A protein has these predicted regions:
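Multi-pass membrane proteins that catalyze or facilitate reactions on polyprenyl-/lipid-phosphate substrates
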Residues: 1-151
Length: 151
């Protein structure tokens, strides 16, 4: 099961990166490492790969401190989400006509609030050196999905 394997991969990367607590600043990160991080972000196209999980982990391995890694990870997501939005504009206009503006607005508001709270929670975990707490979740759900796929 691809999703299960990808969750386990994400868990391994998060666990492996937990002991990296370097002090490198974003401006000191070599350009090549920024490019690698952007490429690794592309792994999130695979189901079960956490985009923020893999990018934060790889940035920590590259030497960024945990909070800077998280902030950089969220910044490099902006071009990806803007690109996806541009690709979907035509479809979005049809959906807006079908669903109605108030429903879209409520969905946008709920999504914005939950995203803000999720990011705040994640930053708090990272600040407390507890990002690796996601590892058991990744392993357990990954193993469960693989097991279910074998039955």
């Amino acid at each position: 099961n691809l999703v299960g394997l990808c969750l386990i991969f994400t868990g391994v990367l998060i666990w492996y990166s937990k002991d990296y607590n370097n002090k490198l600043e974003i401006q000191d990160l070599p350009s090549s490492r920024s490019i690698y991080t952007g490429i690794i972000q592309g792994l999130a196209i695979l189901p079960g790969v956490s985009r923020s999980g893999v990018t934060i982990s790889i940035l920590r391995i590259f030497g960024l401190n945990p909070l800077k890694a998280a902030k950089f990870s969220f910044l490099i997501f902006i071009p990806a989400i803007l690109g996806a939005t541009l690709l979907q504009l035509n479809e979005a206009s049809r959906t807006l006509e079908e669903v109605g503006g108030s429903s879209i607005l409520l969905g946008f508001l709920a999504s914005s609030i939950s995203s803000f709270l999720s990011i705040k929670f994640l930053i708090r975990l990272i600040d407390k050196q507890q990002f690796h707490y996601f590892t058991p979740y990744c392993f357990l759900v990954g193993i469960f999905l693989i097991y279910e796929g074998l039955i």
